[in-house]
Amino acid sequence: MAADYRDEKFYCQDNNVLYFVFRKDEPWLGVTILSSKALKKREGWEHILLRKETVLRLRDYISHPPYNEIGYFECNCTSEILRVVYEDNFFYVDIFDNSALKLKSGIKTSTYFTERDAPELERILNNMLNLFE
């Protein structure tokens, strides 16, 4: 019998991890940014849930990044937003509450990775997209 979920880890430049979890009984992909230390302890989670269409947009943004253009990827069930900015060969990733966008504050957690690491993240997103039915 296959596992009820699949997870993958993407290690970033600042010792943070983008952690992806797909559960077969849910119609979305969970995305979390946490420190590698928190990953071992399973604490410090900042979570956002993305539907398939949003994951497709995120994958396309990573594979063909528009320079200095902000990508907003909204959670479909809460007010969380995943924000990605590509600038000077780096991708900067934040998770925050939608209301914080108006206030220009309230970032819950953030990380970054280089353009040369992007193909690995694209591979992970493609694997996760294949799990959606």
Descriptions of predicted regions:
Residues M1-E133:
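Positively charged, low-complexity terminal tracts
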